[in-house]
């Protein structure tokens, strides 16, 4: 049903052309809002979709400041272990910390954190020695 309704929305609102969602170099908030209008799309999906457009498909927007990080378990673990947030379960703090770190495009650090969390900074048995963040990681230093 959700997929059908998305196709129907693209047909009705965007003249059967999904690229009209980001046509004309709109600001990132407008693109995220357009994705939020699709049934089933929450903030995480909407910002992730905008992030994919920019990062993987090189879609230009007037700005990138409304493309937030998606605070999944890997990203939150990285931020917590790096000492950027006090608790691993704090979604809002993760988003705002990413905005503080790189206000012009907070979502750009999403994939790097996700990959580091999946490959090195695992919940159990982290591979700190191979991690690209080990030189600036207080958790690694404390374990060392």
What are these regions (language model features)?
Residues 1-144:
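HhH-family (HhH-GPD) DNA N-glycosylase catalytic core used in base-excision repair
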């Amino acid at each position: 049903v959700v997929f059908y309704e998305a196709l129907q929305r693209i047909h009705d609102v965007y003249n059967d052309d999904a690229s009209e969602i980001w046509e004309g170099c709109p600001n990132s908030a407008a693109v995220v809002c357009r994705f939020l209008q699709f049934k089933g799309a929450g903030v995480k999906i909407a910002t992730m979709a905008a992030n994919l457009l920019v990062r993987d498909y090189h879609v230009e927007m007037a700005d990138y400041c409304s493309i937030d990080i998606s605070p999944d378990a890997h990203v939150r673990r990285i931020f917590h272990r790096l000492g950027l947030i006090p608790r691993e379960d704090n979604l809002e703090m993760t988003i705002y910390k990413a905005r503080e770190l790189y206000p012009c495009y907070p979502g750009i650090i999403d994939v790097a954190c996700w990959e580091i969390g999946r490959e090195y900074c695992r919940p159990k048995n982290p591979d700190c020695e191979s991690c690209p963040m080990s030189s600036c990681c207080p958790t690694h230093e404390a374990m060392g």
